[in-house]
Amino acid sequence: MPKRSCPFADAAPLQLKVHVGLKELSHGVFAERYSREVFERTKQLLFQGARAYRDHISSEDCSVNHLQESLKSGVVGAPQPARGQMLIGPDGRLTRCQAQASEGGLPRTAPIACSSCMRSVDGKAVCSQCERALCGQCVYTCWGCGALACVLCGLADYADDGEKTLCTSCAMFEA
C-alpha cells in the first residue's frame, strides 16, 4: 500500500534554517534603536573632534578678535568686508585669528613672493579680495571703491573712456 500524502501541504510553511545577522536586525526589528545609536555615536565623535581642535588652536596662543573689532581698521568711515579664514567661536559668532586681523597678516622675517609674478615683495600691498601679497607692478586699484586687487580678483573694463579695473564687489553692481 502506498504512503498517504499530507492533507495540509498548502497551509504549512517550509521550515528552513534562516541566518539572521546584524544587517538584517539593523534594517528590521531593531532599525530605530541601531540608527539612534549610530546617530549618537557620530554626534559624540563630531563634538569631541571640534573640542580637540578648539583646544589645539587655543594652545597655540592665537588670540581671537571679534568681527566688529577687525572691521574697525581700514578706510576712514567705510567698514571693510571680512576676508580670509574665519573661525566659529564657542559662542557661535564668527571670529578672526589675530595674525589675520593684523595689517596683511604677513610675517616680516622671510621674503614674500608676489602671487602673480613671483618677485620679492615687502608685504605692504595685499589684495583686498583674496589677501594675496602683490608687488607694485601687479597691484590694481579698483575704479569704484579704491580697493587693491590682484590679476585674479580684478576685472578689466574696456569702455569708451579707456581701461578701468573693478574689484569683484564693484563689478557686481556695474554689470
Swiss-Prot record:
Induction statement: By p53, camptothecin, stroke injury and infection with coxsackievirus B3. This up-regulation is sufficient to induce apoptosis in neural tissue.
Post-translational note: Phosphorylated by ABL2/ARG in response to oxidative stress.
Coiled coil: none
Residues the record lists as Phosphoserine modifications: S70
Cellular compartments per GO CC: cytoplasm; nucleoplasm
Annotated InterPro entries: Siva
Entry keyword Aminoacyl-tRNA synthetase: no
Intracellular or extracellular location(s): Cytoplasm; Nucleus
Annotated stretches, region: Interaction with BCL2L1 isoform Bcl-x(L) and inhibition of BCL2L1 anti-apoptotic activity: 36-55
Record-level Gene Ontology MF annotations: CD27 receptor binding; metal ion binding; tumor necrosis factor receptor binding; virus receptor activity
Keyword Zinc belongs to the record: yes
Co-factor binding details: Isoform 1 binds 3 zinc ions. Isoform 2 binds 2 zinc ions.
Tissue occurrence: Highly expressed in testis, heart, liver, lung, and muscle, and less in kidney, spleen and brain.
UniProt xrefs under Pfam families: Siva
Biological processes per GO annotation: extrinsic apoptotic signaling pathway
Phosphotyrosine found at: Y34
Essential cofactor(s): Zn(2+)
Domain of life: Eukaryota
PANTHER family xref list: APOPTOSIS REGULATORY PROTEIN SIVA
Assembly, per entry: Binds through its N-terminal region to the C-terminus of CD27 and to PXMP2/PMP22. Binds to the C-terminus of TNFRSF18/GITR. Isoform 1 binds to BCL2L1/BCLX isoform Bcl-x(L) but not to BAX.
Protein name in the entry: Apoptosis regulatory protein Siva
Natural source organism: Mus musculus (Mouse)
